[in-house]
A protein has these predicted regions:
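Acidic, metal/ion-coordinating pockets
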Residues: 1-377
């Protein structure tokens, strides 16, 4: 748990959530202990190519940076807001394994000695339910789990069998007060069924479909496990990488998790850009948080989605009821493979897009000079 001087813990709990944290490939190459750079992509055969692309776009990078470097201005924001709990979707394996997943071309890995890139932001929980956690096989997943465990960072959605993978990360915030993080890797995000954990095989907490029956089953299971005083985050890696559309099945699935009493926050990710926000029955639904850290700098083809922009989400929940009390989001830009405060045009773009995409849910967004964007409902 991270200390905070915010409202008393018995009254409110503030969280930090963000989208995909992709610290492998190009970012790993500038950290103190870069892993083997070999890639198997059609256009790039070395992770160093992504460093060169970033330099071509925005100037020379240091040959080596410290592990905190990629977080840049985000660290000051975290110090300012002081959330009780910090949760990210870590979309890279932490391993030196060379046993890449067969027939998979786009692979992410970070050297285990660079785990400080995660711990420097004092992250409490890494969600591993995504389509890169097994890029380097089950050996790579085991290395990731072991490295994070030794760093004192909890994980959700992955384990050495299905029971372990289904277990929530339990984050204590005060006596009798916990935040539980359940996480699911949906087939719709490109996670293959073979990555599912089984009674005899390690893997992910796999979500085969977004049916009403599946949502009810998951929701009732979580509702039965939560105790009085618990707050529950349900993390879903779902949908494609590009496009603002929110499917009817995603909408209904999120609602069902809340209707069953399972989720206080539905924390969605996979899209490389922000998507709409809904407040349903006083519960927060983030349909797509966008990327937080990536090495896409200098890559062309998706500029209309502004993959260089990121949001730091800071929801505040009523500790007694789980209801959303307030939500702010701080705009960032990825430049020189690190987070910096978004320039005025970037902040305006995020404001306009969030307002446009959230309006259908009765959610509205306003800009504030102090801490970025405020969400209203």
């Amino acid at each position: 748990m991270n200390e905070t001087d915010d409202a008393p813990l018995h009254a409110r709990v503030r969280l930090f959530l963000c989208g995909d944290v992709m610290t492998g490939r190009g970012i790993d190459q500038i950290l103190p202990h870069p892993g083997a750079p070999r890639l198997y992509e059609r256009y790039c055969r070395s992770a160093r190519d992504y460093v060169r692309l970033a330099e071509r776009a925005n100037g020379e990078l240091p040959a080596r940076v410290d592990c905190a470097y990629p977080w840049g201005d985000a660290l000051a924001e975290l110090d300012r807001v002081r959330p009780h709990v910090r949760i990210v979707n870590l979309e890279t394996a932490i391993t030196t394994s060379d046993a890449r997943w067969p027939d998979k071309a786009v692979l992410y890995r970070m050297h285990p000695r660079n785990v400080g890139c995660v711990s420097s932001a004092r992250i409490d929980c890494c969600v591993l339910a995504n389509n890169h956690s097994l890029d380097w096989g089950r050996e790579g997943l085991a290395d990731t789990l072991d490295t994070l465990r030794r760093a004192g960072i909890r994980t959700a959605s992955a384990g050495d069998d299905d029971a372990h993978a289904a277990r929530p990360a339990t984050l204590g915030v005060a006596p009798g007060r916990r935040v539980l993080v359940y996480a699911y890797a949906a087939e719709t995000s490109g996670v293959p069924p073979s990555w599912a954990a089984t009674p005899r095989r390690g893997g992910l907490n796999y979500l085969a479909d977004l049916s009403s029956g599946r949502a009810t089953q998951i929701g009732e299971r979580i509702a039965a496990q939560r105790r009085e005083g618990d707050l529950v985050v349900v993390s879903l890696h779902w949908g494609g990488n590009w496009g603002f559309e929110i499917g009817d099945d995603e909408h209904a699935f999120a609602h069902r998790l809340i209707d069953t009493g399972a989720a206080d926050i539905v924390y969605g990710h996979s899209s490389h850009h922000v998507k709409g926000i809904e407040i349903y029955r006083e519960r927060l639904i983030l349909y797509g948080c966008g990327d937080c850290l990536n090495d896409y700098e200098g890559i062309h083809g998706h500029q209309p989605f502004r993959p260089d922009l990121a949001l730091m989400y800071f929801p505040v929940l009523d500790a007694g009821s789980g209801a959303l009390v307030e939500l702010s989001a701080v705009p960032m830009q990825i430049r020189n493979l690190r987070l910096q405060r978004a320039p005025a045009d970037g902040k305006a773009w995020l404001h306009a897009v969030l307002e446009r995409e959230s309006r259908r849910f009765g959610t509205h967004v306003s800009a504030c000079d102090v801490d970025g964007l405020h969400v209203h409902w």
